[in-house]
Amino acid sequence: MGNCVGRQRRERPAAPGHPRKRAGRNEPLKKERLKWKSDYPMTDGQLRSKRDEFWDTAPAFEGRKEIWDALKAAAYAAEANDHELAQAILDGASITLPHGTLCECYDELGNRYQLPIYCLSPPVNLLLEHTEEESLEPPEPTPSVRREFPLKVRLSTGKDVRLSASLPDTVGQLKRQLHSQEGIEPSWQRWFFSGKLLTDRTRLQETKIQKDFVIQVIINQPPPPQD
């Protein structure tokens, strides 16, 4: 778990006007994914709710909003396995990492920012849920009106996969196509574009995706059962 605290309660930052002294060193963001176990099994939806609650309330306590925004973008990029982008965001905002993780960060004024581990990676005991979104999806467009184009998706394993897509396609439909090509269960897939999580009912045309853009797919495969 490295230097990250596995507790799910966020510690209150330093009192306003009294920034904690920044550590003298700055390490690059580590590429390994932090592993942790939740006190109780949670679904993907519950995890998203906890993250939204943190990001919505964190700037109200202490720190600069632009730094919180940069940390949020860097956290999403790192989880999507785009460490180069995450590091560029941190460098651009002059954020230092004494331990090479986003658990403890400092801005150029010496203010400390602490991110809970649930904002950095899903728990190992994340519950896979089958939503009703697939059954609510509108019917697929007829072949006569489909204008297909190659859609590039980058898996969290580092592999790039090209899917045959059209703008009216939903993410749920494309998840099933990725399953047929790579054998990755749709419930294991979490699709991100421009730092936002795409739901199964989201259509490609709603994402404003353009040619040669890449969609990040984080794979949350459940651990093998232990004897």
Swiss-Prot record:
Region (Disordered): 1-35
Xref: Pfam families: UBD, ubiquitin
InterPro entries reported for this sequence: DC-UbP/UBTD2_N, DC-UbP/UBTD2_N_sf, Ubiquitin-like_dom, Ubiquitin-like_domsf, Ubiquitin_dom, UBTD1/2
Record-annotated membrane-spanning stretches: none
Gene3D superfamilies given in the database record: Phosphatidylinositol 3-kinase Catalytic Subunit, Chain A, domain 1, Ub domain-containing protein, DC-UbP/UBTD2, N-terminal domain
Residue span(s) of domain Ubiquitin-like: 149-224
Feature: compositional bias, Basic and acidic residues: 24-35
Function, as annotated: May be involved in the regulation of cellular senescence through a positive feedback loop with TP53. Is a TP53 downstream target gene that increases the stability of TP53 protein by promoting the ubiquitination and degradation of MDM2.
Subunit text: Interacts with UBTD1.
PANTHER family linked to this entry: UBIQUITIN DOMAIN CONTAINING 1 PROTEIN-RELATED
Name the UniProt record assigns to this protein: Ubiquitin domain-containing protein 1
Organism: Rattus norvegicus
